[in-house]
Amino acid sequence: MPEHQQPELPHASAAGANGAATDMVITRNLDGSMKESAPPATVPAQSPLPLPASAVIVDTSASPHAAHRPVPVGNVRLSDAFLAPRLRINRETTIPSQYAHLEETNRLRNFRRAAGEFDGPFEGIYFNDSDVYKWLEAAAWAIAANPDDREDDLTAMIDAVIGLIEGAQDETGYVNTYFSVDLVGERWSDLRNKNELYCAGHLIQAAIAHHRATGSDRLLNVATRFADLICDTFGPVAEGKREQTDGHEEIELALIELYRTTGERRYLDQARYFLDIRGTGTIGGDAYH
């Protein structure tokens, strides 16, 4: 390697003005200047894959105060010898193995129990549902980055998990397997410690990812029903609501992104309420949290 250069950075391609992908390797010299060159001949050329226009992780396209605009997942393609194989292994091996772990640890069985398909105790810790939702979000973005593989086993896994969540949602829109069956009366009783709104936030984020990656409203419908219940439940006492906020932040950013996805203003207002009520009238203690 020439002594005046640092190691090559991973190279990527981005869609240009005409929609074509332009590959480049970016090298940073010691003086801080950047050099662009063609990728190594060993990297096979690929065509960019079409994705829904809204396949962005955070959508600030209609946010007037946002300084940056996101790039859709399909507009950037890593093709280097380091990160690209990692993404492929994540897609083909890691995410499917995590699905198996969700089964082995009975996280998925908890949803079957909530749906009345299994008679037995809840297993695991009270925030286990969030692990299922985090897996769904990761799997959805993996599908978004590989739309030609949407009919493979990973898609079937996603659909199966969504079916379990649909079955676990009750008639009010509530979804949380820990507070189902024998603990229904304890819902919203320990927001500081039991992560109910935290789990709800991860469900919403998983639903948004799935919707943006596939165009399907299936999980999004579950999430909006739950979000509507949350909006109807939490707010000023004068409105007959619970004047509380969560102990573990998460629901706020999820509701903001749900607003960006649906255009439903009440989700943005609810996120603002949760932020404004935190710490009101106190500098510590349970009321602060």
What does each model-identified segment do?
Residues 2-289:
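Glycan-recognition and catalytic cores of secretory/periplasmic carbohydrate-active enzymes
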